[in-house]
Amino acid sequence: KACTTLMARLKIMANLDIAEKRLPQDGRIVYKQFNRKGIDVDLRVSTAPLNHGEGAVMRLLDKQKSTLPLTALGFSDQNLEMYRDLIKRPYGMILHCGPTGSGKSMTLYSALNEINDPGKCIRTAEDPIEYTLKGLLQMQMHRQIGLTFAAALRSFLRQDPDIILVGEIRDQETAQIAVEAALTGHMLFSTLHTNDAPGTISRLTEMEIEPFMISASLTCICAQRLLRRVCKTCGTVTEAEGREDEILQRAIDWSGPIPHAKEGGCPACRGIGYKGRVGIHELMPISEELVKGINGEYDTAKLKRIAVRNRMKTL
């Protein structure tokens, strides 16, 4: 009885349908000015029907980290310079791919902050809205009433924004409209669940998007992951031995001492040896050679070889 009451209260707070117990639901709870610093606390709520009743998971979003600069996200110098140039283009499509929790949303928000100015109209379609940013017009999806990513995109195209963010491309309809938006003078940002950058091309093809439309609309694809950061308080460094220096230099453009986590850690990292996370990125700008490969319907392995020849650093 207590669980049923608690679940009903949680659904009300997250603006979910308390009568719907057969389908998964996603919502959001916001506590305004939760602490003395006036920081808002944002919770993403997900419910699902399970064999012994409904289950709920709440994900705490760090509002203080909503405006991290691109320089703090772990981009290499080469990738950072390239990415900054790509996001400032007037039209095209930039896709971020990776599993859930790989930092895609954070990178997208940071990119929008980088290019945001009063002279640009930026619209976002999100499910749910993770962070509220100044200067952006953000739309919360409500699939129960038919407000989907595809419906939001159609609406945006009639309102002539400069930049569009779509939380995720989930189906063929959304993918088709996203491509059309990129081809009609808009810069579109979105995400896909694929393992690496070249694999995104295959995913779009599976969604029945014509190869020539993919190559014409895509600006770049960025695959990413989050790795644990060695604790700065107790971490140690060692010099590269043997061919380690050569291998690291060639693979990830790294030279110098190699950081190591201390076994047992320290109080600062709670005995783990790691504190915080840092992103790694696989940036694949669409070159003329890749355009030919996409139009020629090359497989993922061949597209990856072309991208590596064009100086893409793989994950």
Over which residues does each language-model region extend?
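Short, flexible helix-loop junctions that flank or precede catalytic/ligand sites
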Residues: 1-315
